[in-house]
């Protein structure tokens, strides 16, 4: 197996600063709720030998990549192959985490190496399921069976795509002739009805985002997990969440705002953003926002 990661750790310097500010630095528990290939975890474990990691990852394919990538830290890591919203259901009440990291961005491996149709850069089967055994429906099933009105609502609600009506109509018209099976087919359908003058990003970007979020139930999982994350922090423990689009960022922002100021404190009023230099080195980081809360 290739032991190189596809992904770059976003906002790593800011995350390390949070760990360095922890008042105690001995036998601490670090939970990575979205382990992915383990790029944040590797950088953190290399730098801080007082941390033990619990790594949570739903996709068994990418979890195996993480195991290989993090093999030198094997004695300090416990792996959990499931969705992060399931992890705390049986979590022991007397074991609290000192640092919880949540990176809500999709891994570059899923875009570039999984062959599951997360990206339109290659022609792949239109699937988008992080785990085929627990996700009930694929992206292909959605675009081939949902009504025009349901598609329009799904695309708009989960991506704020202003041309969701045009796109849903084009999808329904196309599938009358041929079943939509691949990423390039769907991208082509969308591109043909998108106003050329309005193109700042690839016309298919937001629709692909909406389908991925829906297929993997991402927003509901986030909402279910937020209370678990803060409740399972130790005193002075930190919850750090990286978001990549406005919908999930609003969910995190509103939840943090709802927390009792007697129990929790926001580290900064505004989200922490990547620097110009980081964006230059890692273009996908440009959308990242880091929000942080501390248990008092």
Swiss-Prot record:
Catalyses which reaction(s): cytidine(1402) in 16S rRNA + S-adenosyl-L-methionine = N(4)-methylcytidine(1402) in 16S rRNA + S-adenosyl-L-homocysteine + H(+)
Keyword field contains Cytoplasm? yes
Where located?
Cytoplasm
**Where along this sequence does the record place binding of S-adenosyl-L-methionine?**
38-40, 57, 80, 103, 110
| One Pfam family, short name | Methyltransf_5
Sorted keywords for this record are:
Cytoplasm, Methyltransferase, rRNA processing, S-adenosyl-L-methionine, Transferase
Q: Any idea of its EC number? A: 2.1.1.199
One GO molecular-function entry: rRNA (cytosine-N4-)-methyltransferase activity
InterPro entries, alphabetically?
RsmH, SAM-dep_MeTrfase_MraW_recog, SAM-dependent_MTases_sf
Q: Which SUPFAM superfamilies match?
A: Putative methyltransferase TM0872, insert domain (SSF81799), S-adenosyl-L-methionine-dependent methyltransferases (SSF53335)
Q: Which GO terms describe its cellular component?
A: cytoplasm
Residues of the signal peptide:
none
Q: Does the keyword Ion transport apply?
A: no
NCBIfam families recorded: 16S rRNA (cytosine(1402)-N(4))-methyltransferase RsmH
Q: Which PANTHER family match?
A: 12S RRNA N4-METHYLCYTIDINE METHYLTRANSFERASE, S-ADENOSYL-METHYLTRANSFERASE MRAW
| Biological function | Specifically methylates the N4 position of cytidine in position 1402 (C1402) of 16S rRNA.
As for family, the record states:
Belongs to the methyltransferase superfamily. RsmH family.
Identify this protein by name.
Answer: Ribosomal RNA small subunit methyltransferase H
Q: Which organism is it from?
A: Borreliella burgdorferi (strain ATCC 35210 / DSM 4680 / CIP 102532 / B31) (Borrelia burgdorferi)
Query: What gene is it encoded by?
Result: rsmH
